[in-house]
Amino acid sequence: MKRVLTALAATLPFAANAADAISGAVERQPTNWQAIVMFLIFVVFTLGITYWASKRVRSRSDYYTAGGNITGFQNGLAIAGDYMSAASFLGISALVFTSGYDGLIYSLGFLVGWPIILFLIAERLRNLGRYTFADVASYRLKQGPIRILSACGSLVVVALYLIAQMVGAGKLIELLFGLNYHIAVVLVGVLMMMYVLFGGMLATTWVQIIKAVLLLFGASFMAFMVMKHVGFSFNNLFTEAMAVHPKGSAIMSPGGLVNDPISALSLGLGLMFGTAGLPHILMRFFTVSDAREARKSVFYATGFMGYFYILTFIIGFGAIMLVGANPEYKDAAGALIGGNNMAAVHLANAVGGNLFLGFISAVAFATILAVVAGLTLAGASAVSHDLYANVFRKGATEREELRVSKITVLVLGVIAIILGVLFENQNIAFMVGLAFAIAASCNFPIILLSMYWSKLTTRGAMMGGWLGLVTAVVLMVLGPTIWVQILGHEKAIFPYEYPALFSISVAFIGIWFFSATDNSAEGNREREQFRAQFIRSQTGYGVEQGRAH
Protein backbone atom coordinates (compact mmCIF):
# COMPACT_ATOMS: atom_id res chain seq x y z
CA MET A 1 0.00 0.00 0.00
CA LYS A 2 2.98 2.29 0.52
CA ARG A 3 3.66 1.99 -3.21
CA VAL A 4 0.10 3.09 -3.87
CA LEU A 5 0.51 6.13 -1.63
CA THR A 6 3.80 7.05 -3.27
CA ALA A 7 2.32 6.85 -6.75
CA LEU A 8 -0.84 8.71 -5.83
CA ALA A 9 1.03 11.44 -4.00
CA ALA A 10 3.06 11.96 -7.13
CA THR A 11 -0.06 12.39 -9.22
CA LEU A 12 -2.14 14.61 -6.97
CA PRO A 13 -2.38 17.74 -9.05
CA PHE A 14 -1.18 20.36 -6.61
CA ALA A 15 1.49 18.44 -4.75
CA ALA A 16 4.09 19.80 -7.16
CA ASN A 17 6.19 16.72 -6.53
CA ALA A 18 6.10 17.19 -2.80
CA ALA A 19 7.10 14.40 -0.46
CA ASP A 20 7.11 11.00 -2.11
CA ALA A 21 6.89 12.51 -5.57
CA ILE A 22 10.62 12.99 -5.24
CA SER A 23 11.36 10.05 -3.03
CA GLY A 24 14.39 9.14 -1.01
CA ALA A 25 17.56 11.20 -0.94
CA VAL A 26 17.52 13.97 -3.51
CA GLU A 27 20.44 13.76 -5.91
CA ARG A 28 21.48 17.34 -6.49
CA GLN A 29 22.20 17.84 -10.18
CA PRO A 30 24.98 19.96 -11.71
CA THR A 31 23.97 23.62 -12.07
CA ASN A 32 21.82 23.85 -15.22
CA TRP A 33 22.67 27.29 -16.64
CA GLN A 34 20.29 27.01 -19.62
CA ALA A 35 17.41 26.35 -17.23
CA ILE A 36 18.42 29.21 -14.95
CA VAL A 37 18.69 31.69 -17.85
CA MET A 38 15.29 30.65 -19.25
CA PHE A 39 13.72 30.86 -15.83
CA LEU A 40 15.19 34.34 -15.28
CA ILE A 41 13.65 35.42 -18.60
CA PHE A 42 10.27 34.11 -17.37
CA VAL A 43 10.67 35.91 -14.03
CA VAL A 44 11.62 39.23 -15.64
CA PHE A 45 8.71 38.97 -18.08
CA THR A 46 6.15 38.11 -15.39
CA LEU A 47 7.45 40.83 -13.06
CA GLY A 48 6.93 43.23 -15.98
CA ILE A 49 3.34 41.99 -16.21
CA THR A 50 2.99 42.50 -12.46
CA TYR A 51 4.16 46.11 -12.82
CA TRP A 52 1.66 46.62 -15.67
CA ALA A 53 -1.12 45.03 -13.60
CA SER A 54 -0.28 47.12 -10.52
CA LYS A 55 -1.11 50.28 -12.51
CA ARG A 56 -4.58 48.88 -13.21
CA VAL A 57 -5.45 47.66 -9.71
CA ARG A 58 -7.40 50.58 -8.28
CA SER A 59 -10.25 48.90 -6.40
CA ARG A 60 -11.22 45.84 -4.40
CA SER A 61 -12.85 44.36 -7.51
CA ASP A 62 -9.65 44.84 -9.54
CA TYR A 63 -7.57 43.17 -6.83
CA TYR A 64 -9.79 40.13 -6.15
CA THR A 65 -11.31 39.50 -9.59
CA ALA A 66 -9.36 41.58 -12.16
CA GLY A 67 -12.48 43.76 -12.44
CA GLY A 68 -14.49 40.87 -13.88
CA ASN A 69 -12.98 41.63 -17.28
CA ILE A 70 -11.20 38.34 -18.05
CA THR A 71 -12.74 36.53 -21.06
CA GLY A 72 -13.96 32.94 -20.93
CA PHE A 73 -11.07 31.74 -23.09
CA GLN A 74 -8.46 33.57 -21.01
CA ASN A 75 -10.01 32.29 -17.79
CA GLY A 76 -10.11 28.75 -19.15
CA LEU A 77 -6.37 28.91 -19.84
CA ALA A 78 -5.75 30.43 -16.39
CA ILE A 79 -7.80 27.70 -14.67
CA ALA A 80 -5.82 25.07 -16.58
CA GLY A 81 -2.64 26.86 -15.50
CA ASP A 82 -3.83 26.83 -11.90
CA TYR A 83 -4.73 23.13 -12.01
CA MET A 84 -1.94 21.58 -14.14
CA SER A 85 0.99 21.39 -11.78
CA ALA A 86 4.53 20.08 -11.95
CA ALA A 87 3.20 16.91 -10.32
CA SER A 88 0.70 16.47 -13.13
CA PHE A 89 3.51 16.73 -15.65
CA LEU A 90 6.34 14.89 -13.89
CA GLY A 91 4.28 12.70 -11.54
CA ILE A 92 1.79 11.22 -13.98
CA SER A 93 4.37 10.69 -16.72
CA ALA A 94 6.49 8.92 -14.05
CA LEU A 95 3.48 6.80 -13.11
CA VAL A 96 3.03 5.79 -16.77
CA PHE A 97 6.80 5.17 -16.98
CA THR A 98 6.65 2.70 -14.08
CA SER A 99 3.13 1.24 -14.36
CA GLY A 100 1.91 1.86 -17.91
CA TYR A 101 -1.85 1.92 -18.45
CA ASP A 102 -2.69 2.70 -14.80
CA GLY A 103 -1.17 6.14 -15.31
CA LEU A 104 -3.88 6.97 -17.85
CA ILE A 105 -6.60 6.02 -15.37
CA TYR A 106 -5.21 8.44 -12.79
CA SER A 107 -4.59 11.24 -15.25
CA LEU A 108 -8.17 11.07 -16.53
CA GLY A 109 -9.41 10.76 -12.96
CA PHE A 110 -8.47 14.39 -12.37
CA LEU A 111 -10.95 15.47 -15.05
CA VAL A 112 -13.94 13.78 -13.42
CA GLY A 113 -14.65 16.73 -11.13
CA TRP A 114 -14.89 19.23 -13.96
CA PRO A 115 -18.27 18.16 -15.41
CA ILE A 116 -19.67 18.66 -11.89
CA ILE A 117 -18.29 22.20 -11.88
CA LEU A 118 -19.57 22.81 -15.42
CA PHE A 119 -23.13 21.55 -15.02
CA LEU A 120 -23.84 22.15 -11.32
CA ILE A 121 -21.67 24.96 -10.01
CA ALA A 122 -20.09 27.43 -12.46
CA GLU A 123 -23.19 29.34 -13.62
CA ARG A 124 -24.91 29.64 -10.25
CA LEU A 125 -21.65 30.43 -8.48
CA ARG A 126 -21.01 33.39 -10.79
CA ASN A 127 -24.60 34.67 -10.52
CA LEU A 128 -24.66 34.54 -6.71
CA GLY A 129 -21.12 35.46 -5.66
CA ARG A 130 -18.73 38.39 -5.93
CA TYR A 131 -15.25 37.52 -4.65
CA THR A 132 -15.26 34.21 -2.73
CA PHE A 133 -17.44 31.11 -2.57
CA ALA A 134 -18.51 32.20 0.94
CA ASP A 135 -20.54 34.94 -0.79
CA VAL A 136 -22.63 32.16 -2.32
CA ALA A 137 -22.90 29.99 0.80
CA SER A 138 -23.98 32.96 2.93
CA TYR A 139 -26.42 34.44 0.38
CA ARG A 140 -29.52 33.50 2.44
CA LEU A 141 -27.83 32.07 5.54
CA LYS A 142 -26.30 33.91 8.50
CA GLN A 143 -23.25 35.84 7.32
CA GLY A 144 -21.04 35.49 10.40
CA PRO A 145 -21.06 31.74 11.13
CA ILE A 146 -21.05 30.66 7.47
CA ARG A 147 -18.21 32.99 6.50
CA ILE A 148 -16.13 31.83 9.48
CA LEU A 149 -16.66 28.18 8.49
CA SER A 150 -15.96 28.87 4.79
CA ALA A 151 -12.86 30.91 5.60
CA CYS A 152 -11.55 28.19 7.93
CA GLY A 153 -12.14 25.53 5.26
CA SER A 154 -10.38 27.71 2.68
CA LEU A 155 -7.42 28.58 4.90
CA VAL A 156 -6.81 24.97 5.94
CA VAL A 157 -6.82 23.83 2.30
CA VAL A 158 -4.57 26.74 1.26
CA ALA A 159 -2.14 26.12 4.15
CA LEU A 160 -1.82 22.40 3.42
CA TYR A 161 -1.26 23.08 -0.29
CA LEU A 162 1.25 25.85 0.32
CA ILE A 163 3.41 23.64 2.54
CA ALA A 164 3.30 20.84 -0.06
CA GLN A 165 4.12 23.33 -2.83
CA MET A 166 7.04 24.93 -1.00
CA VAL A 167 8.65 21.61 -0.07
CA GLY A 168 8.01 20.30 -3.58
CA ALA A 169 9.48 23.47 -5.09
CA GLY A 170 12.66 23.20 -3.04
CA LYS A 171 13.20 19.52 -3.88
CA LEU A 172 12.34 19.97 -7.55
CA ILE A 173 14.61 22.97 -8.05
CA GLU A 174 17.43 21.19 -6.23
CA LEU A 175 17.01 18.38 -8.75
CA LEU A 176 16.54 20.42 -11.91
CA PHE A 177 18.69 23.49 -11.33
CA GLY A 178 21.29 22.35 -8.83
CA LEU A 179 20.30 25.23 -6.51
CA ASN A 180 20.31 24.96 -2.70
CA TYR A 181 16.95 23.86 -1.21
CA HIS A 182 16.62 26.85 1.15
CA ILE A 183 17.45 29.35 -1.60
CA ALA A 184 14.80 27.75 -3.80
CA VAL A 185 12.10 27.96 -1.10
CA VAL A 186 12.87 31.62 -0.33
CA LEU A 187 12.93 32.48 -4.05
CA VAL A 188 9.51 30.91 -4.66
CA GLY A 189 8.07 32.64 -1.57
CA VAL A 190 9.39 36.10 -2.50
CA LEU A 191 8.22 35.89 -6.13
CA MET A 192 4.82 34.60 -5.03
CA MET A 193 4.38 37.56 -2.67
CA MET A 194 5.43 40.06 -5.36
CA TYR A 195 2.95 38.74 -7.93
CA VAL A 196 -0.01 38.81 -5.54
CA LEU A 197 0.93 41.87 -3.49
CA PHE A 198 1.34 44.25 -6.41
CA GLY A 199 -0.61 42.69 -9.27
CA GLY A 200 -3.53 40.96 -7.52
CA MET A 201 -5.75 38.71 -9.61
CA LEU A 202 -4.78 40.37 -12.91
CA ALA A 203 -1.07 39.53 -12.53
CA THR A 204 -1.89 36.08 -11.11
CA THR A 205 -4.17 35.36 -14.08
CA TRP A 206 -1.53 36.27 -16.67
CA VAL A 207 1.20 34.32 -14.86
CA GLN A 208 -1.12 31.28 -14.97
CA ILE A 209 -1.97 31.85 -18.66
CA ILE A 210 1.70 32.15 -19.67
CA LYS A 211 2.61 29.08 -17.64
CA ALA A 212 -0.25 27.06 -19.22
CA VAL A 213 0.84 28.03 -22.74
CA LEU A 214 4.49 27.15 -22.02
CA LEU A 215 3.56 23.83 -20.41
CA LEU A 216 1.19 22.86 -23.24
CA PHE A 217 3.80 23.81 -25.84
CA GLY A 218 6.57 21.86 -24.10
CA ALA A 219 4.42 18.76 -23.59
CA SER A 220 3.10 18.94 -27.18
CA PHE A 221 6.64 19.11 -28.58
CA MET A 222 7.75 16.14 -26.49
CA ALA A 223 4.72 14.06 -27.51
CA PHE A 224 5.25 15.03 -31.18
CA MET A 225 8.90 13.94 -31.09
CA VAL A 226 7.97 10.65 -29.41
CA MET A 227 5.29 9.93 -32.03
CA LYS A 228 7.68 10.93 -34.82
CA HIS A 229 10.15 8.35 -33.48
CA VAL A 230 7.53 5.57 -33.89
CA GLY A 231 6.16 6.77 -37.24
CA PHE A 232 3.06 8.34 -35.61
CA SER A 233 1.73 4.87 -34.81
CA PHE A 234 0.32 4.14 -31.35
CA ASN A 235 0.67 0.44 -32.10
CA ASN A 236 4.42 0.89 -32.63
CA LEU A 237 4.65 3.04 -29.48
CA PHE A 238 3.03 0.41 -27.27
CA THR A 239 4.85 -2.50 -28.92
CA GLU A 240 8.29 -0.89 -28.48
CA ALA A 241 7.49 0.10 -24.89
CA MET A 242 6.39 -3.45 -23.99
CA ALA A 243 9.57 -4.81 -25.56
CA VAL A 244 11.88 -2.81 -23.26
CA HIS A 245 9.82 -2.48 -20.04
CA PRO A 246 10.67 -4.99 -17.25
CA LYS A 247 6.96 -5.82 -16.82
CA GLY A 248 6.49 -6.52 -20.53
CA SER A 249 2.87 -6.72 -21.68
CA ALA A 250 1.64 -6.24 -18.08
CA ILE A 251 2.03 -2.47 -18.51
CA MET A 252 -1.00 -2.53 -20.82
CA SER A 253 -3.25 -3.97 -18.09
CA PRO A 254 -5.13 -1.96 -15.43
CA GLY A 255 -5.36 -2.65 -11.71
CA GLY A 256 -1.71 -2.83 -10.76
CA LEU A 257 -1.76 0.02 -8.26
CA VAL A 258 -4.88 -0.14 -6.10
CA ASN A 259 -5.87 -3.47 -4.57
CA ASP A 260 -8.27 -2.07 -1.97
CA PRO A 261 -11.57 -0.91 -3.55
CA ILE A 262 -12.59 1.20 -0.52
CA SER A 263 -9.39 3.26 -0.70
CA ALA A 264 -9.75 3.56 -4.48
CA LEU A 265 -13.35 4.78 -4.16
CA SER A 266 -12.47 7.14 -1.33
CA LEU A 267 -9.58 8.64 -3.29
CA GLY A 268 -11.77 9.00 -6.38
CA LEU A 269 -14.54 10.79 -4.47
CA GLY A 270 -11.98 13.03 -2.79
CA LEU A 271 -10.49 14.06 -6.13
CA MET A 272 -13.86 14.48 -7.83
CA PHE A 273 -15.67 16.52 -5.17
CA GLY A 274 -12.48 18.08 -3.80
CA THR A 275 -11.84 19.76 -7.14
CA ALA A 276 -15.27 21.40 -6.88
CA GLY A 277 -14.41 22.72 -3.41
CA LEU A 278 -10.94 24.19 -3.99
CA PRO A 279 -11.09 27.90 -3.06
CA HIS A 280 -8.48 29.10 -5.55
CA ILE A 281 -10.28 27.33 -8.42
CA LEU A 282 -13.75 28.59 -7.41
CA MET A 283 -12.40 32.14 -7.07
CA ARG A 284 -11.52 32.17 -10.75
CA PHE A 285 -15.20 32.13 -11.76
CA PHE A 286 -15.67 35.64 -10.40
CA THR A 287 -13.05 37.05 -12.81
CA VAL A 288 -15.42 36.83 -15.80
CA SER A 289 -18.31 39.16 -16.63
CA ASP A 290 -21.27 36.76 -16.44
CA ALA A 291 -22.48 33.16 -16.10
CA ARG A 292 -22.11 32.50 -19.84
CA GLU A 293 -18.40 33.33 -19.69
CA ALA A 294 -18.08 31.20 -16.52
CA ARG A 295 -19.47 28.19 -18.42
CA LYS A 296 -17.11 28.87 -21.32
CA SER A 297 -14.22 29.03 -18.83
CA VAL A 298 -14.88 25.48 -17.64
CA PHE A 299 -15.39 24.25 -21.21
CA TYR A 300 -12.02 25.60 -22.35
CA ALA A 301 -10.23 24.56 -19.15
CA THR A 302 -11.50 20.98 -19.43
CA GLY A 303 -10.39 20.84 -23.07
CA PHE A 304 -6.88 22.10 -22.30
CA MET A 305 -6.49 19.76 -19.32
CA GLY A 306 -7.85 16.73 -21.18
CA TYR A 307 -5.39 17.38 -24.01
CA PHE A 308 -2.55 17.81 -21.52
CA TYR A 309 -3.26 14.54 -19.68
CA ILE A 310 -3.33 12.63 -22.98
CA LEU A 311 0.09 14.14 -23.75
CA THR A 312 1.46 12.93 -20.39
CA PHE A 313 0.38 9.39 -21.35
CA ILE A 314 2.35 9.59 -24.61
CA ILE A 315 5.31 11.17 -22.78
CA GLY A 316 5.29 8.35 -20.21
CA PHE A 317 5.42 5.64 -22.87
CA GLY A 318 8.03 7.65 -24.76
CA ALA A 319 10.13 7.70 -21.59
CA ILE A 320 9.87 3.89 -21.30
CA MET A 321 11.17 3.61 -24.84
CA LEU A 322 13.80 6.39 -25.07
CA VAL A 323 14.88 6.82 -21.42
CA GLY A 324 14.26 3.49 -19.69
CA ALA A 325 16.22 1.58 -22.33
CA ASN A 326 19.10 4.09 -22.43
CA PRO A 327 21.96 3.45 -19.95
CA GLU A 328 23.00 7.11 -20.28
CA TYR A 329 20.13 8.06 -17.92
CA LYS A 330 20.84 5.33 -15.33
CA ASP A 331 23.09 5.39 -12.28
CA ALA A 332 25.56 2.68 -11.26
CA ALA A 333 22.78 0.66 -9.61
CA GLY A 334 20.67 0.74 -12.77
CA ALA A 335 18.06 3.15 -11.37
CA LEU A 336 16.96 6.30 -13.16
CA ILE A 337 19.19 9.28 -12.24
CA GLY A 338 17.24 11.53 -9.87
CA GLY A 339 14.43 9.00 -9.40
CA ASN A 340 11.47 7.98 -11.57
CA ASN A 341 9.95 11.44 -11.39
CA MET A 342 12.79 12.66 -13.59
CA ALA A 343 11.57 10.47 -16.49
CA ALA A 344 9.91 13.37 -18.35
CA VAL A 345 12.93 15.64 -17.75
CA HIS A 346 15.32 13.02 -19.16
CA LEU A 347 12.94 12.56 -22.11
CA ALA A 348 13.15 16.32 -22.78
CA ASN A 349 16.92 15.90 -23.07
CA ALA A 350 16.53 12.82 -25.28
CA VAL A 351 14.20 14.49 -27.80
CA GLY A 352 15.36 18.13 -27.68
CA GLY A 353 18.88 18.24 -26.28
CA ASN A 354 20.22 20.36 -23.46
CA LEU A 355 18.48 23.57 -24.57
CA PHE A 356 15.02 21.98 -24.48
CA LEU A 357 15.92 20.33 -21.17
CA GLY A 358 16.57 23.84 -19.81
CA PHE A 359 13.21 25.01 -21.18
CA ILE A 360 11.28 22.15 -19.54
CA SER A 361 13.10 22.69 -16.23
CA ALA A 362 12.21 26.39 -16.29
CA VAL A 363 8.57 25.55 -17.13
CA ALA A 364 8.43 23.18 -14.13
CA PHE A 365 9.54 26.06 -11.85
CA ALA A 366 7.09 28.48 -13.51
CA THR A 367 4.36 25.92 -12.89
CA ILE A 368 4.94 26.02 -9.14
CA LEU A 369 4.93 29.84 -9.07
CA ALA A 370 1.59 30.01 -10.91
CA VAL A 371 -0.07 27.59 -8.48
CA VAL A 372 1.23 29.20 -5.27
CA ALA A 373 0.19 32.67 -6.48
CA GLY A 374 -3.41 31.48 -6.90
CA LEU A 375 -3.37 29.78 -3.50
CA THR A 376 -2.02 32.88 -1.76
CA LEU A 377 -4.66 35.16 -3.27
CA ALA A 378 -7.43 32.74 -2.24
CA GLY A 379 -6.09 32.65 1.33
CA ALA A 380 -5.75 36.43 1.51
CA SER A 381 -9.30 37.01 0.24
CA ALA A 382 -10.70 34.56 2.82
CA VAL A 383 -9.11 36.63 5.61
CA SER A 384 -9.73 40.15 4.28
CA HIS A 385 -13.13 39.74 2.59
CA ASP A 386 -14.83 36.92 4.51
CA LEU A 387 -13.47 37.47 8.02
CA TYR A 388 -12.36 41.11 8.28
CA ALA A 389 -14.89 42.95 6.09
CA ASN A 390 -17.95 40.77 6.75
CA VAL A 391 -17.50 39.44 10.30
CA PHE A 392 -15.04 41.35 12.49
CA ARG A 393 -15.19 44.82 10.93
CA LYS A 394 -18.48 45.20 9.09
CA GLY A 395 -18.59 48.38 7.06
CA ALA A 396 -14.83 48.49 6.50
CA THR A 397 -13.80 50.64 3.54
CA GLU A 398 -12.31 49.12 0.37
CA ARG A 399 -8.96 50.70 1.27
CA GLU A 400 -8.96 49.04 4.71
CA GLU A 401 -9.98 45.67 3.26
CA LEU A 402 -7.23 45.80 0.63
CA ARG A 403 -4.66 46.74 3.27
CA VAL A 404 -5.65 43.69 5.35
CA SER A 405 -5.49 41.51 2.23
CA LYS A 406 -1.95 42.64 1.42
CA ILE A 407 -0.79 42.19 5.01
CA THR A 408 -2.23 38.66 4.85
CA VAL A 409 -0.27 37.98 1.65
CA LEU A 410 2.95 38.94 3.45
CA VAL A 411 2.08 36.82 6.49
CA LEU A 412 1.13 33.80 4.33
CA GLY A 413 4.33 34.18 2.32
CA VAL A 414 6.58 34.31 5.39
CA ILE A 415 4.76 31.36 7.02
CA ALA A 416 5.02 29.36 3.77
CA ILE A 417 8.79 29.98 3.58
CA ILE A 418 9.34 29.06 7.25
CA LEU A 419 7.23 25.88 7.03
CA GLY A 420 8.85 24.98 3.70
CA VAL A 421 12.25 25.05 5.44
CA LEU A 422 11.02 23.21 8.56
CA PHE A 423 9.32 20.42 6.57
CA GLU A 424 12.31 19.83 4.26
CA ASN A 425 12.85 16.22 5.31
CA GLN A 426 9.28 15.35 6.33
CA ASN A 427 6.81 13.14 4.50
CA ILE A 428 4.15 15.71 3.67
CA ALA A 429 2.33 13.68 0.99
CA PHE A 430 -0.61 13.25 3.39
CA MET A 431 -1.20 17.03 3.33
CA VAL A 432 -2.34 16.93 -0.28
CA GLY A 433 -4.78 14.08 0.31
CA LEU A 434 -6.04 15.88 3.40
CA ALA A 435 -6.51 19.14 1.47
CA PHE A 436 -8.67 17.36 -1.11
CA ALA A 437 -10.61 15.55 1.63
CA ILE A 438 -11.37 18.82 3.47
CA ALA A 439 -12.38 20.61 0.26
CA ALA A 440 -14.69 17.70 -0.57
CA SER A 441 -16.07 17.28 2.97
CA CYS A 442 -16.51 20.90 4.09
CA ASN A 443 -16.55 23.32 1.15
CA PHE A 444 -18.28 21.25 -1.54
CA PRO A 445 -21.38 20.07 0.43
CA ILE A 446 -22.10 23.62 1.65
CA ILE A 447 -21.69 25.17 -1.82
CA LEU A 448 -23.83 22.51 -3.51
CA LEU A 449 -26.66 22.39 -0.98
CA SER A 450 -26.81 26.16 -0.48
CA MET A 451 -27.53 26.48 -4.21
CA TYR A 452 -29.82 23.47 -4.72
CA TRP A 453 -31.57 22.48 -1.46
CA SER A 454 -34.33 24.81 -0.35
CA LYS A 455 -34.54 23.34 3.18
CA LEU A 456 -30.91 24.11 4.09
CA THR A 457 -30.51 26.26 7.21
CA THR A 458 -27.54 27.89 8.92
CA ARG A 459 -27.65 25.33 11.73
CA GLY A 460 -27.47 22.43 9.27
CA ALA A 461 -24.69 23.99 7.21
CA MET A 462 -22.62 24.78 10.31
CA MET A 463 -23.00 21.39 11.99
CA GLY A 464 -22.52 19.37 8.80
CA GLY A 465 -19.61 21.50 7.57
CA TRP A 466 -17.67 21.34 10.83
CA LEU A 467 -18.43 17.61 11.19
CA GLY A 468 -17.07 16.97 7.67
CA LEU A 469 -13.93 19.01 8.31
CA VAL A 470 -13.17 17.44 11.71
CA THR A 471 -13.96 13.90 10.46
CA ALA A 472 -11.57 14.30 7.51
CA VAL A 473 -8.75 15.50 9.78
CA VAL A 474 -9.31 12.88 12.52
CA LEU A 475 -9.57 9.93 10.10
CA MET A 476 -6.46 11.08 8.24
CA VAL A 477 -4.51 11.27 11.52
CA LEU A 478 -5.75 7.81 12.58
CA GLY A 479 -5.04 6.29 9.14
CA PRO A 480 -1.94 4.37 7.95
CA THR A 481 -0.11 7.42 6.54
CA ILE A 482 0.13 9.51 9.71
CA TRP A 483 -0.55 7.01 12.52
CA VAL A 484 1.88 4.34 11.28
CA GLN A 485 4.38 5.93 8.86
CA ILE A 486 4.83 9.29 10.62
CA LEU A 487 3.91 8.69 14.28
CA GLY A 488 5.47 5.22 14.29
CA HIS A 489 2.60 3.15 15.73
CA GLU A 490 2.39 -0.50 14.79
CA LYS A 491 -1.15 -0.55 13.39
CA ALA A 492 -3.53 2.13 12.11
CA ILE A 493 -6.79 2.71 14.01
CA PHE A 494 -8.54 3.73 10.75
CA PRO A 495 -7.51 1.18 8.10
CA TYR A 496 -7.89 3.22 4.89
CA GLU A 497 -5.47 5.66 3.27
CA TYR A 498 -8.06 8.30 2.32
CA PRO A 499 -11.01 9.47 4.44
CA ALA A 500 -13.15 11.24 1.80
CA LEU A 501 -15.77 8.47 1.38
CA PHE A 502 -16.57 8.61 5.10
CA SER A 503 -16.10 12.32 5.80
CA ILE A 504 -18.22 13.39 2.81
CA SER A 505 -21.00 11.05 3.97
CA VAL A 506 -20.81 12.49 7.51
CA ALA A 507 -20.99 16.05 6.13
CA PHE A 508 -24.05 15.46 3.92
CA ILE A 509 -25.90 13.46 6.59
CA GLY A 510 -25.08 16.11 9.21
CA ILE A 511 -26.30 18.95 6.98
CA TRP A 512 -29.52 17.08 6.16
CA PHE A 513 -30.29 16.03 9.75
CA PHE A 514 -29.61 19.35 11.48
CA SER A 515 -31.44 21.30 8.76
CA ALA A 516 -34.45 18.98 8.74
CA THR A 517 -34.80 19.22 12.54
CA ASP A 518 -34.37 23.01 12.61
CA ASN A 519 -37.82 24.45 13.40
CA SER A 520 -36.61 27.89 14.48
CA ALA A 521 -38.04 31.11 13.07
CA GLU A 522 -34.63 31.89 11.60
CA GLY A 523 -34.56 28.52 9.84
CA ASN A 524 -38.02 29.05 8.36
CA ARG A 525 -37.01 32.51 7.12
CA GLU A 526 -33.93 31.06 5.40
CA ARG A 527 -36.06 28.43 3.66
CA GLU A 528 -38.47 31.10 2.42
CA GLN A 529 -35.61 33.08 0.90
CA PHE A 530 -34.57 30.18 -1.34
CA ARG A 531 -36.96 31.18 -4.13
CA ALA A 532 -35.39 34.64 -4.51
CA GLN A 533 -31.93 33.06 -4.47
CA PHE A 534 -33.00 30.48 -7.07
CA ILE A 535 -34.26 33.18 -9.45
CA ARG A 536 -31.03 35.15 -9.06
CA SER A 537 -28.91 32.01 -9.58
CA GLN A 538 -30.77 31.13 -12.80
CA THR A 539 -31.18 34.57 -14.36
CA GLY A 540 -28.29 36.56 -12.94
CA TYR A 541 -30.76 39.36 -12.23
CA GLY A 542 -29.07 41.89 -9.97
CA VAL A 543 -25.57 40.52 -10.47
CA GLU A 544 -22.81 43.08 -10.98
CA GLN A 545 -20.97 42.75 -14.27
CA GLY A 546 -17.76 43.93 -15.87
CA ARG A 547 -15.86 46.69 -14.13
CA ALA A 548 -18.73 47.31 -11.74
CA HIS A 549 -18.54 43.66 -10.70
Curated annotation (Swiss-Prot):
Bilayer topology term: Multi-pass membrane protein
Localization per Swiss-Prot or TrEMBL: Cell inner membrane
Keyword Ion transport tagged: yes
Pfam families reported in the protein's UniProt record: SSF (PF00474)
Classification via PROSITE patterns: NA_SOLUT_SYMP_1, NA_SOLUT_SYMP_2, NA_SOLUT_SYMP_3
GO biological process annotation, one example: plasma membrane acetate transport
GO molecular function annotation: acetate transmembrane transporter activity; glycolate transmembrane transporter activity; symporter activity
Keywords: Cell inner membrane, Cell membrane, Ion transport, Membrane, Sodium, Sodium transport, Symport, Transmembrane, Transmembrane helix, Transport
tRNA processing listed as a keyword: no
Transmembrane segments: 33-53, 77-97, 103-123, 148-168, 183-203, 206-226, 262-282, 303-323, 355-375, 404-424, 428-448, 464-484, 493-513
Main location class: membrane
InterPro entries: Cation/Ac_symporter_ActP (IPR014083), Na/Glc_symporter_sf (IPR038377), Na/solute_symporter (IPR001734), Na/solute_symporter_CS (IPR018212), Sodium:Solute_Symporter (IPR050277)
HAMAP family: Acet_symport_ActP (MF_01426)
Role, per record: Transports acetate.
Family statement: Belongs to the sodium:solute symporter (SSF) (TC 2.A.21) family.
Protein name as annotated: Cation/acetate symporter ActP
Organism name: Citrobacter koseri (strain ATCC BAA-895 / CDC 4225-83 / SGSC4696)
Gene that produces this protein: actP
